[in-house]
Amino acid sequence: MELLYIDEAVVVCVKPARVLSTDEPGGLPELVREALGDSQADIRTVHRLDRVVSGVMVLARSAESASELSRQIREDKFQKEYLAVVHGVPEADKGTLTDLLYRDKARRMTMVAEAPGKGVQEAVLDYEVLSRAENLSKVRIHLRTGRTHQIRVQFASRGMPLVGERKYSTLEDPCEIALWSHKIGFTHPVTGKFMTFSKEPPKVYPWSIIA
């Protein structure tokens, strides 16, 4: 568990793949407590990454800090930037993807809807292609909305599944999903200072073959 920043209000860390963001046995808050050497530490989840996704996250160290960070997320003042490697090449080097998505709870999957309806929500993201190699594209992503599996579904539905995707792709890639929480930015809940934290993906496939 890599800790990037610690103070009395927040902990910024790098979430490993296959770890839940929520506070349960083996979840990220428990791993943070172990890293801090304090099994009773107050560590609270304020935003989530899918279990299979890795990268930078912030956790609150009090109810007050959690409330303030959650407010920033609700009011779209919390910045999140992702990196992904997808199969194929987007039509444009930069653009916006907009879809209607709904959650199939029985199958535990997010699906693209053809028309508005009950449980259907708009999903919007901005992307920019950073580089290409071997019919793969590395993209930078900013979410305008935060739907479950949004990035994964929006690219997969256009024939560009993320490398390592298991749920929304039939391709068999020899790696974890290539979706990485690259950068976060938020106003510190105590000091009021705006802070940003970033971490590059590990140099493993497919990140190792695409600059």
Write out the residue ranges for each language-model feature.
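RNA pseudouridine synthases
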Residues: 1-124, 131-134, 178, 204-209
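Pseudouridine synthases involved in rRNA/tRNA modification
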Residues: 1-10, 16-22, 144, 148-211
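A structural micro-motif recognizing beta-strand termini
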Residues: 87, 141-144
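Short, low-complexity Ser/Thr-rich regulatory SLiMs
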Residues: 129-132, 188
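Short histidine-centered loop motifs in beta-beta connectors
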Residues: 134, 139-142
